[in-house]
Amino acid sequence: MNQHGRSAEPGVASEGIAPYGDAHRGIAAKRKKTTTARISQMRVDGEKIAVLTAYDATFAAAADAAGVDCIMVGDSLGMVCQGRTTTVGVSLEDMLYHTRCVSQGIARADGSALIIADLPFGSYQQSNEQAIASAVQLMQAGAHMVKLEGGDWWTVDIVEFLVQRGIPVCAHLRLTPQTVSALGGYRVQGRSEEAAEKLRVDAGALDNAGASMMVLEMIPTELATSITSEMKSCATIGIGAGSGTAGQVLVMHDMLGINLGRMAKFVRNFMRDAEDVPTAFAAYVAAVKDGSFPDDKLHGFL
């Protein structure tokens, strides 16, 4: 029955009760839209930025309603959605499909989260022209920002090329899943003085090139905190990089405890103490905002 005491017809939403993603409209509409300018201001103000991956309309709308600032349509979908062992096989077409799903879910819910979409392996490495063609397609699919991996000179050149043409960029420094084989497997990066210095130099170059955000993955806490303090305008987002970054990101499946393998040290299962998925999302946002996640002793690396 609906609120007027009348039974709804099968397959038809009750009066005043919105179906699927629209059910989150009332919550999400209370927040201002997250923009690149808003991200920059949060960084300056010291307000933690909560980022979460999502790959479809329903979960994207739920994450947005829970207060997630940015939703990342990551090429991690290759592993959690497609069953691959790495992200290398994810295509641009895959990314476009899932970006459209997320964008439509947030739009339907009148949401406010900023959407970041990955440029997958092979979609930007050939040339600046290939990079912008791929990035434009992702923006047309609903992304507000594109993410690409690496900090070598040619990657920095692509970042600058895209930014100069009006495409916001999120960079991604070690561990970058697309290059996991070249880096010798999934392991913490930047522990030697030489490796740490390279990460500092790469991060500075990406900052100067105009990257709005930068994911720092599996980097010692002290190094990630130091890099964050050296940024002129780029907001750092940590995953296994300690609590000193401007924000945090987790793969949705990981933070819900849905993992077929061994859970990474930097992951916290927010579903364990939640009665449902939206509650788990809200708990994650609250923990990022108040600084209780990550706990450097439990989730960080020395």
UniProtKB/Swiss-Prot annotation:
What EC designation does it have?
2.1.2.11
Q: How is the cofactor bound?
A: Binds 1 Mg(2+) ion per subunit.
Could you list this entry's UniProt keywords, alphabetically sorted. Cytoplasm, Magnesium, Metal-binding, Pantothenate biosynthesis, Transferase
Q: Name one Pfam family in it.
A: Pantoate_transf
Kindly tell me the pathway this chain contributes to: Cofactor biosynthesis; (R)-pantothenate biosynthesis; (R)-pantoate from 3-methyl-2-oxobutanoate: step 1/2
Q: Which cofactor does it need?
A: Mg(2+)
Q: What is this enzyme's class at the first EC digit?
A: transferase
**Which sites bind 3-methyl-2-oxobutanoate?**
D75, S76, D118, K147
Q: Please tell me the species this chain comes from.
A: Zymomonas mobilis subsp. mobilis (strain ATCC 31821 / ZM4 / CP4)
Q: Which HAMAP family match?
A: PanB
Query: What is the official name of this protein in its record?
Result: 3-methyl-2-oxobutanoate hydroxymethyltransferase 1
Please report any disulfide bonds recorded for this protein chain, giving both cysteine positions. Answer: none
Q: Which domain of life is it from?
A: Bacteria
